[in-house]
Amino acid sequence: MEKKTLTYIQGIEIFRRKIELLPKNKNLLSRSRSLRKGYVLSEVVFWKQVRNKEFHQIDFDRQKIIGNYIVDFYIKSLGVVIEIDGSSHNDKEDYDNKRQLFLESLDLVVYRISDYRIKNDLIDVMKDLEDFIIEKFS
């Protein structure tokens, strides 16, 4: 199967991944929309970095429904879920593990970023995301 180029990061070719149609619980549509209007600071800060294909021409979805879950960000062309872990995630380790196993069962890759790092180290967060994408998809 021929690889298709998605973009270049640091001069390195990044290839698309073919992800099958994902399950979607339509009962979560209104919740997903309301979360997009929410103002979790770290999510807003990250979104400003990636919206409108501003991050290497890669298209990000925000508050994407996958199965019975709503993920923070999703890159369809790579099959990557990006989760921002803040204080609300500290007491939900079992839930997060179950959710991650489900996402990985769909052949998705989960990338986690701490809320604290986005607020305090954004440049390195974006550099680390570049490095992750290069490592996994070049």
Q: Where in the sequence are the language-model features?
A:
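Solvent-exposed, charged helical/coil patches
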Residues: 1-57, 136-138
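Basic, amphipathic alpha-helical patches used to engage nucleic acids or provide basic targeting signals
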Residues: 35, 39, 62-135
